[in-house]
């Protein structure tokens, strides 16, 4: 039913990387991308090399690194309450630049959605990759995250934020 659609599989338990060769063989047989995840690392976490296993596409998913709240939290979104730093975003950007030489298409998904962190980090990643930002944003975003001033600019007459480097 889904054979005409690209498939990506996100595996989180270490048992999948204990026999990495067999896991890759299984994924490759089904032309499925091995989702490269960024999350806190524990003994039971999967081990990954951040390299693509197929050439059709690459999928990076950033959950955040809030290890203190990953397993023990009052609200489920607390585990994703993590704002990546500029160097961490830069590392993702460098990885994406490298894999784009190998794959036809790459995707990066920021899943650290608590407190709008996913939006902030996605904008920073797009800026790092010199990708155009066409969306407008509420000015409250830059008040809360002043580091976005280099990425977004305020247009007073419209009372929205627009990309600072609009092409």
Regions inferred by a protein language model and the residue ranges of each:
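Residues lining hydrophobic/aromatic ligand-binding pockets adjacent to catalytic sites
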Residues: 1-167
